[in-house]
């Protein structure tokens, strides 16, 4: 009998992204192949300029790679035209960035519902789900608060709820704790990790704070556009986490 093939929610194959500059061709992402399963939370780390943010933008279907494949649920994002990539982004990808980009004049629940509204999926079930998700994130009493009436950590939780509300296959986070103090950062990432596992999403978080890797299943390290190391065991990951505490 043959061995069953693993079906990953996300798989990239030899992804390359180059830019032309006055000094020549810049290789921002250099032959990166990775896989993330449903229900797996992965951290992407590396020094400034390592290519991790460019890679995340490619995975979010915001940038097209120069070459390579990006398979999301088996569909190649790299071959899509701009219109189809926008549709894919709305339907299958959730993302939250360092700046949470909440609409300042919408309440917490309205900000979360906005993603469903954009997808023409805002019905009674969607409205109930938005409230339940915010309550799960500890914001049950903040549903009608505007962003300016919430702390940075609370705003980031609203952004997480918005990223998850439309049941995406892939959830991406770019430095979600950069503006938070350590205690709130831990709370946000621990909650985010729990939801990724609980809901069976594939999750990737870019972070400069190695301490936040405590809550992930694997750590992928980039340098000079290349994927140079993968930390898979708890001992390896906690060694990396502890190095960030010094």
List the predicted regions and their residue ranges:
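Short, Lys/Arg-enriched N-terminal segments with co-localized hydrophobic residues
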Residues: 1-4
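ABC family nucleotide-binding domain
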Residues: 8-215, 219-222
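Conserved beta-strand-loop-alpha-helix hinge in the C-terminal portion
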Residues: 226-246
């Amino acid at each position: 009998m043959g061995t069953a093939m693993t079906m990953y929610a996300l798989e990239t194959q030899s992804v390359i992204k180059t830019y032309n500059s006055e000094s020549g061709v810049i290789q921002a992402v250099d032959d990166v192949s990775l896989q993330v399963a449903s229900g797996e939370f992965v951290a992407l780390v590396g020094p400034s300029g390592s290519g991790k943010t460019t890679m995340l933008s490619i995975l979010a279907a915001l940038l097209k790679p120069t070459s390579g494949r990006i398979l999301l649920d088996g569909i190649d994002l790299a071959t899509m035209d701009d219109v189809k990539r926008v549709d894919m982004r709305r339907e299958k990808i959730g993302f939250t960035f360092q700046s949470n980009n909440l609409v300042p004049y919408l309440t917490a629940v309205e900000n979360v519902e906005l993603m469903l509204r954009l997808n023409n999926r805002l019905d009674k079930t969607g409205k109930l789900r938005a409230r339940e998700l915010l309550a799960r994130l500890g914001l049950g009493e903040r549903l009608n608060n505007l962003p300016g009436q919430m702390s940075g950590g609370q705003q980031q939780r609203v952004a997480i709820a918005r990223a998850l509300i439309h049941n995406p296959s892939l959830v991406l986070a770019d430095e979600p704790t950069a503006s938070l103090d350590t205690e709130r950062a831990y709370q946000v990432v621990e909650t985010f990790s729990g939801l990724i596992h609980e809901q069976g999403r594939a999750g990737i978080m870019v972070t400069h704070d190695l301490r936040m890797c405590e809550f992930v299943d694997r750590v992928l390290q980039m340098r000079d556009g290349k994927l140079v190391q993968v930390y898979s065991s708890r001992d390896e990951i906690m060694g990396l986490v502890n190095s960030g505490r010094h």
